[in-house]
């Protein structure tokens, strides 16, 4: 009788010494894992774009800081040079006036090495296509710079555009190394650096961020005045 009962129990017992309900417990655990993975994926889909936007905003804020430093450096230099920026002072007197027509940007920053202190402020963190310059001599070239300069900017002229992100559009002026801007010129930002947004620095060292549609308004270009931008 006992032998028959034992045989009956063994016949109904799962193979591999598994207790009843083990498979269902394992299946439930697998479902839990899949649900957890799905939840993590949803959270990541929500948070990652927000994190990317936060990083982009941080880089743009840092870029504004760079431009503020550039603007203040130009103003400091002008105090020691009869209220003129380097572009209006002869090379013989420590300026870069004779170099302005070449379209090169780096010489104008080189003469500001004392005021800028470090060449790192000439590179935007969002400018991943270019490497940050390490010194003001051998490593400072247009290929290391993130910012353009307006050759016609004047110290004391608040609305005068001084500098800005290099991803400005309409940069190709036929037969000239400089971009010529007058009132009504179509201007904007490319997708690079700040995703069709950008920062502008003015002669009074103020910095303004603007969207693609507002950049023309912020430039404040007056009728009859032409601004020549050297874009690296």
Regions found by a protein language model. Give the residues of each.
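Short catalytic/ligand-binding loop motif for oxyanion handling, primarily in non-cytosolic enzymes
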Residues: 78-79, 85-88, 94-96, 129-135, ...
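Structural recognition of the beta-strand scaffold that forms the well-ordered cores
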Residues: 86-87, 121-125, 160-163, 199-201, ...
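N-terminal leader/signal peptides at the extreme start of proteins
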Residues: 1-28
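Conserved hydrophobic/amphipathic alpha-helical signal-anchor segments
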Residues: 45, 49-106, 118, 207
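N-terminal single-pass transmembrane signal-anchor helix
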Residues: 21-55
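Acidic, glycine-rich loop-and-strand cores that form catalytic or ligand-binding grooves
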Residues: 119-182
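C-terminal accessory segments of extracellular proteins
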Residues: 173-232
């Amino acid at each position: 009788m006992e032998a028959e009962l034992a045989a009956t129990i063994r016949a109904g017992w799962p193979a591999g010494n598994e207790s009843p309900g083990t498979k269902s417990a394992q299946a439930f655990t697998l479902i839990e894992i899949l649900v957890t993975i799905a939840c993590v994926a949803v959270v990541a889909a929500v948070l990652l774009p927000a994190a990317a936007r936060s990083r982009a905003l941080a880089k743009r804020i840092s870029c504004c800081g760079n431009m503020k430093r550039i603007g203040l450096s130009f103003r400091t230099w002008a105090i020691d040079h009869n209220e003129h920026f380097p572009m209006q002072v002869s090379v013989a007197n420590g300026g870069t006036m004779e170099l302005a027509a070449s379209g090169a940007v780096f010489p104008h920053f080189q003469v500001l090495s004392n005021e800028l202190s470090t060449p790192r402020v000439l590179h935007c963190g969002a400018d991943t296509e270019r490497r940050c310059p390490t010194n003001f001599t051998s490593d400072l070239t247009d290929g290391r710079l993130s910012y353009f300069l307006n050759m016609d900017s004047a110290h004391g002229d608040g609305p005068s555009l001084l500098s800005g992100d290099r991803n400005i559009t309409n940069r190709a002026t036929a037969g000239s190394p400089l971009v010529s801007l007058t009132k009504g010129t179509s201007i904007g930002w490319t997708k690079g650096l700040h995703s069709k947004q950008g920062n502008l620095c003015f002669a009074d060292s103020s910095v303004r961020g603007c969207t693609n549609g507002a950049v023309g308004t912020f430039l404040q270009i007056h009728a009859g005045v032409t601004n020549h931008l050297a874009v690296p």
